């Protein structure tokens, strides 16, 4: 659709982990993003959608098992948005952090005033933090 939603996004919302598993194991991107902001390359992934509802914890578990990035930042993270104790536990067990924890770990500060002055600030912030996380994972 116009927001970049695919059948996979709807399967997440419907808690249809069987079709999601088939699609991802068949080559679909586990970190597929919506296009809520077409100007941004950092929109919510399937995992963000899964953790928004406590009932979709099985989808959350599947996405994590299949390699979803638990620390993707938009500037919030899936853990910031998570509903339900099972989703939060699954994320934490997989190493997920809140955006504040990531900011502190990578010494990157979110400046909301700067964001109001410079529309590209959020994009730059997300890119910097996602790149830092990716490099840290590669060096582990």
Residue ranges of model-derived segments:
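Ankyrin-repeat boundary/"N-cap" motif
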Residues: 1-8, 33-49, 72-81, 102-108
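Generic detector of contiguous secondary-structure segments
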Residues: 2-23, 28-30
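Ankyrin repeat domain, specifically the short helix-to-loop turn at the C-terminus of the second helix
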Residues: 21-29, 61-69, 92-97
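Substrate-binding/catalytic groove segments of enzymes
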Residues: 57, 70-72
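Ankyrin-repeat-protein effector appendages
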Residues: 66, 83-140
């Amino acid at each position: 659709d116009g927001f970049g939603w695919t059948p996979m996004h709807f399967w997440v919302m419907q808690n249809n982990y069987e079709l999601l598993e088939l699609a991802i194991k068949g080559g679909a991107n586990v970190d597929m993003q919506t296009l809520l902001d077409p100007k941004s390359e950092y929109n919510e992934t399937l995992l963000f959608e899964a953790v928004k509802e406590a009932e979709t914890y099985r989808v959350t578990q599947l996405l994590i098992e299949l390699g979803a990035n638990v620390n993707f930042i938009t500037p919030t993270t899936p853990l910031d948005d998570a509903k339900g104790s099972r989703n939060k536990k699954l994320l934490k067990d997989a190493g997920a952090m809140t955006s504040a924890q990531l900011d502190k770990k990578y010494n990157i500060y979110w400046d909301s005033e700067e964001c109001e002055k410079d529309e590209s600030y959020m994009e730059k912030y997300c890119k910097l933090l996602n790149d830092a996380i990716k490099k840290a994972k590669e060096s582990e």
